[in-house]
Amino acid sequence: MTSPSTSKASQVTIAILGGGSMGSAIARGLVTSGLCPASHISVADHNPSKLEALRSEVGVAISPKAKDILEASPDLCILAVKPQVLNNLIDEVGDALSGSLIVSIAAGVTLATLQEALGEGERIVRVMPNLPVAVRQGASAVAPGLWATENDVQLCLELFGALGSAAAMTEERLEVEGAVVGCAPAFFALLVDTLTRAAIDAGLPAAQARDLLNTTMGGVSSMLSQSQEHPRAYMERVTSPGGTTSAALHELEPLMAEGSFKAVEAALARACKLSQNG
Protein backbone atom coordinates (compact mmCIF):
# COMPACT_ATOMS: atom_id res chain seq x y z
CA MET A 1 0.00 0.00 0.00
CA THR A 2 1.25 3.50 -0.84
CA SER A 3 2.23 5.48 2.24
CA PRO A 4 0.82 9.02 2.68
CA SER A 5 4.29 10.53 2.23
CA THR A 6 4.76 8.97 -1.23
CA SER A 7 1.20 9.07 -2.61
CA LYS A 8 0.23 11.60 -5.26
CA ALA A 9 -2.60 12.87 -3.07
CA SER A 10 -0.15 13.90 -0.37
CA GLN A 11 1.68 16.14 -2.83
CA VAL A 12 -1.22 18.12 -4.32
CA THR A 13 -2.24 21.59 -3.23
CA ILE A 14 -5.95 21.96 -2.51
CA ALA A 15 -8.24 24.99 -2.39
CA ILE A 16 -11.63 24.50 -0.76
CA LEU A 17 -14.15 27.20 -1.65
CA GLY A 18 -16.71 27.12 1.15
CA GLY A 19 -15.99 26.55 4.83
CA GLY A 20 -19.42 25.31 5.86
CA SER A 21 -20.19 21.90 7.33
CA MET A 22 -18.99 19.85 4.36
CA GLY A 23 -16.06 22.02 3.30
CA SER A 24 -14.73 22.07 6.85
CA ALA A 25 -15.35 18.33 7.23
CA ILE A 26 -13.28 17.58 4.12
CA ALA A 27 -10.42 19.82 5.24
CA ARG A 28 -10.49 18.36 8.73
CA GLY A 29 -10.59 14.79 7.47
CA LEU A 30 -7.77 15.19 4.96
CA VAL A 31 -5.45 16.68 7.57
CA THR A 32 -6.29 14.32 10.44
CA SER A 33 -5.97 11.30 8.14
CA GLY A 34 -2.32 12.20 7.67
CA LEU A 35 -2.74 12.08 3.89
CA CYS A 36 -2.47 15.82 3.24
CA PRO A 37 -0.33 18.28 5.20
CA ALA A 38 -2.24 21.30 6.48
CA SER A 39 0.19 23.54 4.58
CA HIS A 40 -1.19 22.15 1.30
CA ILE A 41 -4.81 23.08 2.06
CA SER A 42 -6.47 26.51 1.89
CA VAL A 43 -10.11 27.26 2.70
CA ALA A 44 -12.12 30.33 1.71
CA ASP A 45 -15.41 31.43 3.23
CA HIS A 46 -17.17 34.74 3.79
CA ASN A 47 -17.78 33.81 7.45
CA PRO A 48 -14.53 34.47 9.36
CA SER A 49 -15.64 32.70 12.54
CA LYS A 50 -15.96 29.40 10.67
CA LEU A 51 -12.48 29.79 9.24
CA GLU A 52 -10.77 30.79 12.48
CA ALA A 53 -12.15 27.72 14.26
CA LEU A 54 -10.94 25.48 11.44
CA ARG A 55 -7.48 27.05 11.37
CA SER A 56 -7.14 26.68 15.13
CA GLU A 57 -8.17 23.04 14.94
CA VAL A 58 -6.14 21.70 12.01
CA GLY A 59 -3.85 24.52 10.87
CA VAL A 60 -5.04 25.07 7.29
CA ALA A 61 -4.63 28.44 5.58
CA ILE A 62 -7.78 30.57 5.43
CA SER A 63 -9.11 33.57 3.56
CA PRO A 64 -12.44 35.41 3.36
CA LYS A 65 -12.02 35.70 -0.42
CA ALA A 66 -12.01 32.78 -2.84
CA LYS A 67 -9.82 34.60 -5.34
CA ASP A 68 -7.05 34.99 -2.78
CA ILE A 69 -6.48 31.25 -2.35
CA LEU A 70 -6.70 30.66 -6.10
CA GLU A 71 -3.79 33.00 -6.84
CA ALA A 72 -1.36 30.18 -6.03
CA SER A 73 -2.91 28.02 -8.81
CA PRO A 74 -3.82 25.00 -6.66
CA ASP A 75 -3.69 21.55 -8.23
CA LEU A 76 -7.24 20.81 -7.13
CA CYS A 77 -10.15 23.06 -6.23
CA ILE A 78 -13.19 21.81 -4.33
CA LEU A 79 -16.40 23.79 -4.83
CA ALA A 80 -18.03 23.25 -1.43
CA VAL A 81 -20.89 25.73 -1.49
CA LYS A 82 -24.63 25.18 -1.67
CA PRO A 83 -26.09 24.56 -5.15
CA GLN A 84 -28.10 27.77 -4.95
CA VAL A 85 -24.97 29.95 -4.72
CA LEU A 86 -22.61 27.96 -6.95
CA ASN A 87 -23.20 30.13 -10.02
CA ASN A 88 -22.42 33.25 -7.98
CA LEU A 89 -19.16 31.68 -6.82
CA ILE A 90 -18.14 30.76 -10.36
CA ASP A 91 -18.95 34.30 -11.53
CA GLU A 92 -16.91 35.70 -8.63
CA VAL A 93 -13.72 33.74 -9.30
CA GLY A 94 -13.93 33.86 -13.10
CA ASP A 95 -11.00 32.26 -14.91
CA ALA A 96 -9.04 31.72 -11.68
CA LEU A 97 -10.22 28.10 -11.63
CA SER A 98 -8.77 27.35 -15.05
CA GLY A 99 -6.03 24.74 -15.03
CA SER A 100 -6.98 23.21 -11.69
CA LEU A 101 -8.84 19.93 -11.36
CA ILE A 102 -12.28 21.16 -10.31
CA VAL A 103 -14.27 19.02 -7.88
CA SER A 104 -17.89 19.97 -7.22
CA ILE A 105 -19.82 18.56 -4.27
CA ALA A 106 -22.98 20.56 -5.04
CA ALA A 107 -26.04 18.31 -5.07
CA GLY A 108 -28.12 18.39 -8.23
CA VAL A 109 -25.68 20.48 -10.29
CA THR A 110 -24.86 18.29 -13.27
CA LEU A 111 -21.56 17.85 -15.03
CA ALA A 112 -23.09 19.39 -18.16
CA THR A 113 -24.14 22.49 -16.20
CA LEU A 114 -20.71 22.77 -14.60
CA GLN A 115 -18.95 22.32 -17.94
CA GLU A 116 -21.07 25.03 -19.54
CA ALA A 117 -20.32 27.43 -16.68
CA LEU A 118 -16.60 26.67 -16.43
CA GLY A 119 -15.78 26.23 -20.10
CA GLU A 120 -14.84 23.56 -22.59
CA GLY A 121 -11.73 21.58 -21.74
CA GLU A 122 -11.85 22.16 -17.98
CA ARG A 123 -11.30 18.98 -15.95
CA ILE A 124 -14.33 18.50 -13.71
CA VAL A 125 -15.28 15.72 -11.30
CA ARG A 126 -18.47 15.54 -9.27
CA VAL A 127 -18.17 14.02 -5.81
CA MET A 128 -21.04 13.32 -3.44
CA PRO A 129 -19.62 12.86 0.08
CA ASN A 130 -21.52 12.65 3.34
CA LEU A 131 -20.72 14.40 6.60
CA PRO A 132 -18.93 11.53 8.41
CA VAL A 133 -15.92 12.31 6.19
CA ALA A 134 -15.02 14.66 9.07
CA VAL A 135 -14.17 11.61 11.21
CA ARG A 136 -12.90 9.57 8.24
CA GLN A 137 -15.94 7.30 8.22
CA GLY A 138 -17.82 8.89 5.37
CA ALA A 139 -18.89 7.59 1.97
CA SER A 140 -18.29 9.39 -1.33
CA ALA A 141 -19.35 8.79 -4.93
CA VAL A 142 -17.07 10.03 -7.72
CA ALA A 143 -18.27 10.78 -11.29
CA PRO A 144 -15.87 12.25 -13.89
CA GLY A 145 -16.70 14.87 -16.48
CA LEU A 146 -15.85 14.70 -20.16
CA TRP A 147 -12.29 16.04 -19.88
CA ALA A 148 -11.35 14.50 -16.54
CA THR A 149 -8.60 11.90 -16.89
CA GLU A 150 -8.24 8.51 -15.26
CA ASN A 151 -5.51 10.03 -13.09
CA ASP A 152 -7.98 12.71 -11.98
CA VAL A 153 -10.48 10.05 -10.95
CA GLN A 154 -7.83 8.05 -9.11
CA LEU A 155 -6.70 11.17 -7.26
CA CYS A 156 -10.26 11.87 -6.11
CA LEU A 157 -10.69 8.25 -5.05
CA GLU A 158 -7.49 8.44 -3.02
CA LEU A 159 -8.40 11.74 -1.37
CA PHE A 160 -11.97 10.85 -0.50
CA GLY A 161 -11.05 7.24 0.21
CA ALA A 162 -8.87 8.57 3.03
CA LEU A 163 -12.08 9.99 4.52
CA GLY A 164 -13.88 6.63 4.62
CA SER A 165 -14.85 4.85 1.42
CA ALA A 166 -15.09 6.16 -2.15
CA ALA A 167 -16.40 4.61 -5.35
CA ALA A 168 -16.33 5.72 -8.99
CA MET A 169 -19.63 5.56 -10.86
CA THR A 170 -21.72 7.19 -13.57
CA GLU A 171 -23.39 10.52 -12.87
CA GLU A 172 -26.82 8.87 -12.95
CA ARG A 173 -25.80 6.51 -10.17
CA LEU A 174 -24.16 9.36 -8.29
CA GLU A 175 -27.55 11.08 -8.06
CA VAL A 176 -29.00 7.94 -6.45
CA GLU A 177 -26.01 7.73 -4.09
CA GLY A 178 -26.62 11.32 -3.07
CA ALA A 179 -30.27 10.62 -2.33
CA VAL A 180 -29.46 7.56 -0.23
CA VAL A 181 -25.94 7.76 1.19
CA GLY A 182 -25.70 11.55 1.12
CA CYS A 183 -28.88 11.86 3.18
CA ALA A 184 -28.24 8.77 5.32
CA PRO A 185 -26.45 10.59 8.19
CA ALA A 186 -29.63 12.60 8.77
CA PHE A 187 -31.73 9.43 8.47
CA PHE A 188 -29.62 7.62 11.05
CA ALA A 189 -29.60 10.64 13.36
CA LEU A 190 -33.39 10.78 13.07
CA LEU A 191 -33.61 7.11 14.06
CA VAL A 192 -31.46 7.69 17.14
CA ASP A 193 -33.48 10.78 18.02
CA THR A 194 -36.86 9.07 17.74
CA LEU A 195 -35.67 6.00 19.67
CA THR A 196 -34.23 8.31 22.33
CA ARG A 197 -37.56 10.06 22.69
CA ALA A 198 -39.33 6.71 22.90
CA ALA A 199 -36.86 5.58 25.59
CA ILE A 200 -37.43 8.80 27.55
CA ASP A 201 -41.17 8.29 27.31
CA ALA A 202 -40.68 4.76 28.67
CA GLY A 203 -38.68 6.05 31.64
CA LEU A 204 -34.96 6.26 30.73
CA PRO A 205 -33.01 9.49 31.43
CA ALA A 206 -32.34 11.40 28.20
CA ALA A 207 -28.53 11.47 28.39
CA GLN A 208 -28.33 7.79 29.27
CA ALA A 209 -30.70 6.77 26.47
CA ARG A 210 -28.82 8.84 23.89
CA ASP A 211 -25.43 7.48 24.94
CA LEU A 212 -26.59 3.87 24.85
CA LEU A 213 -28.22 4.28 21.45
CA ASN A 214 -25.22 6.10 19.93
CA THR A 215 -22.94 3.31 21.14
CA THR A 216 -25.28 0.67 19.76
CA MET A 217 -25.51 2.40 16.37
CA GLY A 218 -21.73 2.52 16.10
CA GLY A 219 -21.40 -1.09 17.21
CA VAL A 220 -23.91 -2.42 14.68
CA SER A 221 -22.22 -0.43 11.91
CA SER A 222 -18.82 -1.87 12.84
CA MET A 223 -20.16 -5.42 12.99
CA LEU A 224 -21.80 -5.16 9.57
CA SER A 225 -18.70 -3.58 8.02
CA GLN A 226 -16.29 -6.12 9.46
CA SER A 227 -18.39 -9.22 8.80
CA GLN A 228 -19.94 -8.11 5.47
CA GLU A 229 -23.07 -9.88 6.68
CA HIS A 230 -26.29 -8.91 4.93
CA PRO A 231 -28.27 -6.51 7.14
CA ARG A 232 -31.38 -8.67 6.84
CA ALA A 233 -29.44 -11.74 7.96
CA TYR A 234 -28.01 -9.78 10.89
CA MET A 235 -31.48 -8.57 11.87
CA GLU A 236 -32.88 -12.09 11.77
CA ARG A 237 -29.92 -13.43 13.75
CA VAL A 238 -30.49 -11.03 16.63
CA THR A 239 -34.27 -11.53 16.64
CA SER A 240 -35.66 -14.38 18.72
CA PRO A 241 -39.05 -15.71 17.56
CA GLY A 242 -41.75 -14.45 19.90
CA GLY A 243 -39.29 -12.15 21.72
CA THR A 244 -39.23 -8.43 22.40
CA THR A 245 -37.21 -7.56 19.27
CA SER A 246 -39.66 -9.50 17.12
CA ALA A 247 -42.60 -7.61 18.63
CA ALA A 248 -40.85 -4.28 18.11
CA LEU A 249 -39.91 -5.01 14.49
CA HIS A 250 -43.49 -6.02 13.73
CA GLU A 251 -44.49 -2.42 14.46
CA LEU A 252 -41.43 -0.61 13.14
CA GLU A 253 -40.45 -2.31 9.89
CA PRO A 254 -43.55 -1.48 7.79
CA LEU A 255 -43.31 2.18 8.77
CA MET A 256 -39.57 2.37 8.08
CA ALA A 257 -39.85 0.58 4.74
CA GLU A 258 -42.55 2.91 3.41
CA GLY A 259 -40.87 5.99 4.85
CA SER A 260 -37.45 5.09 3.44
CA PHE A 261 -38.74 4.65 -0.11
CA LYS A 262 -40.64 7.94 0.09
CA ALA A 263 -37.61 9.72 1.53
CA VAL A 264 -35.34 8.59 -1.31
CA GLU A 265 -37.96 9.56 -3.89
CA ALA A 266 -38.24 13.01 -2.32
CA ALA A 267 -34.46 13.47 -2.30
CA LEU A 268 -34.18 12.44 -5.96
CA ALA A 269 -37.02 14.78 -6.91
CA ARG A 270 -35.32 17.66 -5.11
CA ALA A 271 -31.99 16.91 -6.79
CA CYS A 272 -33.75 16.90 -10.17
CA LYS A 273 -35.34 20.28 -9.43
CA LEU A 274 -31.99 21.72 -8.38
CA SER A 275 -30.41 20.53 -11.63
CA GLN A 276 -33.21 22.12 -13.67
CA ASN A 277 -32.88 25.40 -11.79
CA GLY A 278 -29.10 25.29 -12.25
What do the PLM-derived regions correspond to, one by one?
Residues 1-64, 68, 72, 76, ...:
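NAD(P)+-binding Rossmann beta1-loop-alpha1 motif at the extreme N-terminus of oxidoreductases
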Residues 2, 214-278:
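NAD(P)-dependent Rossmann-like dehydrogenase/reductase catalytic/cofactor-binding core
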Residues 24, 28-32, 56, 91, ...:
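Short, well-ordered alpha-helices that flank and scaffold nucleotide-derived cofactor binding pockets
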Residues 25, 108, 190-194, 218, ...:
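A generic alpha-helix surface/boundary motif
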Residues 42, 48-49, 58, 66-142:
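Rossmann-like NAD(P)(H) cofactor-binding subdomain of soluble oxidoreductases
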Residues 113-123, 139-177, 188-228, 268-274:
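Internal alpha-helical scaffold of NAD(P)-dependent oxidoreductase catalytic cores
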Residues 129-133, 178-187:
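Glycine/serine-rich anion-binding loops at beta->alpha junctions
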